[in-house]
Amino acid sequence: MGCFFSKKAKRKRNSEEEQPQQDGEEPKQYSWDKREKVDPKDYMFTGLKDQTVGKLPDKVAGQQFVIQECENCNIYIFDHSATITIDDCTNCRIFLGPVKGSVFFRDCKDCKCVVACQQFRTRDCRRMDVFLCCSTQPIIESSTSMKFGCFQYYYPELALQFKEAGLSILNNTWSNIHDFTPVAGETNWSLLPPDAVIQDFIPLPDSDELKCVRVSADVHKSIIPVTWGQRLKKSDESCLVVFFAGDYTTANARKMIDEMVGKGLSLIQTKEVAMKIEDAKRVFQDNITDLICLLEKGPVVALEFNGEGAVDSCQTVINNTFSGTKVFVSESKESASRDVDNFYNFADMQMGM
C-alpha cells in the first residue's frame, strides 16, 4: 500500500516557503522552543562538607539527581525524581523521596539513609544503614556491613509523590536482599532490629528552609505500611487477607492493617498485583466462582498477618468491619500457610516478569 500526496498542496507549501518573513512578524514558536531549560547544577549536590541541604517539594519534579563527594552532611530530597546516583559520600544522612527508576550508591561508607525507589543497588559500599521501600529485589555488590529496615516516613506531599513516581505503597521488598558477590562464611548484610527508630539514624531537618516540610518519622503515620519482612516470625500461624479492586481498596487495606496491628499481630508483607482468572484458580482454588468479575476491575491487595489466633482475629474483623466488601480471608490455620505460599509465590513470579 502506498501513500497519497497532493501536488497542489505541495506547490502551495513551496510558495509559502518562498515568501519572505514580513517585517515585525513574530517567528513561529514550537513546543520544544517553549520547554524550560534545565540546568544540571540545580539537580546536584557535590563536594559538600558539614552542611544541611535539601530540595523542597516540587523542586525536583521528576528530574534525575546526583549526589557526590559529600562528607558529614544531612541531605533531604523531599520530592520525586527519575533516578538518583550517590557517589563517594562519607558519614552522611540522606533522605530520598520516591524515585521512579533506580537509586545507585557507589563507593559510599558510614551513611544512614531513608530511600523509596523501584530499583536499589549498591557497589563498593561499607557500613550503611538503609530504611528502604523498593518495588524490586534490592541488590548489593562488593558491599559489606549493610543493614536494612523498612521505610517509615511521612510528610503531606509524600503520598502524591509516590503516585507521580509510579510506585505502589504496598509493594515493598526491603528485606529480600540479593548479594551479588557473596563471600563463603561471611554475611555482608543483615536486618535492623524491628524497634529501630529512624530519628536515631537520620535527624529531622532543622534548617530554616527545610523545617517548613511537615515531616514525621512516627511509625503509625508512615505512608508505607511497616512490615516485619523476612525476620523470623513470632508464630507458626499466619493468615492471608486479599482485598479486590474498588474505590476504597487501599483505604480498606490500611484500616485492616491498623486493626490487626492494634490487636498485637505482625504485618509480615503486603503486595499489590494484577491477577488473571487462571492465576486466581491456582491461588484461591475452590473459592474462585465469586471472584472472577472482581479480578477484571484491577489489581488485588494482599496482606499477611502473623501471630497466635491470626485467622480467627482476621475473620472477626472482616465480618464486623468489611461486611459489605468482598474479601478473601484464610479459612483455617491449616489452610492459611498454603494460602500465603500460593499467593506470594505467584506474586513473586509476576513481579519478576
Curated annotation (Swiss-Prot):
Region (Disordered) residue spans: 1-37
Basic and acidic residues bias (residue ranges): 25-37
Annotated membrane topology: Lipid-anchor
Lipidated sites in chain (N-myristoyl glycine): 2
Gene Ontology, cellular component aspect: cilium; cytoplasm; periciliary membrane compartment; plasma membrane
GO molecular function: GTP binding; GTPase activator activity
Residues where GTP binds: 101-102, 118-121
Tree of life domain: Eukaryota
Lipid-conjugated positions (S-palmitoyl cysteine): 3
Assigned keywords, A-Z: Cell membrane, GTP-binding, GTPase activation, Lipoprotein, Membrane, Myristate, Nucleotide-binding, Palmitate
InterPro entries (UniProt xref): C-CAP_CF_C-like (IPR017901), CAP/MinC_C (IPR016098), CAP_C_sf (IPR036223), CARP_motif (IPR006599), NDK-like_dom_sf (IPR036850), Tubulin-bd_cofactor_C_dom (IPR012945), XRP2 (IPR039093)
Chain's role: Acts as a GTPase-activating protein (GAP) for tubulin in concert with tubulin-specific chaperone C, but does not enhance tubulin heterodimerization. Acts as a GTPase-activating protein. May act as guanine nucleotide dissociation inhibitor towards ADP-ribosylation factor-like proteins.
Protein name as it appears in the record: Protein XRP2
Organism this protein belongs to: Xenopus laevis (African clawed frog)
Organism ancestry: Eukaryota, Metazoa, Chordata, Craniata, Vertebrata
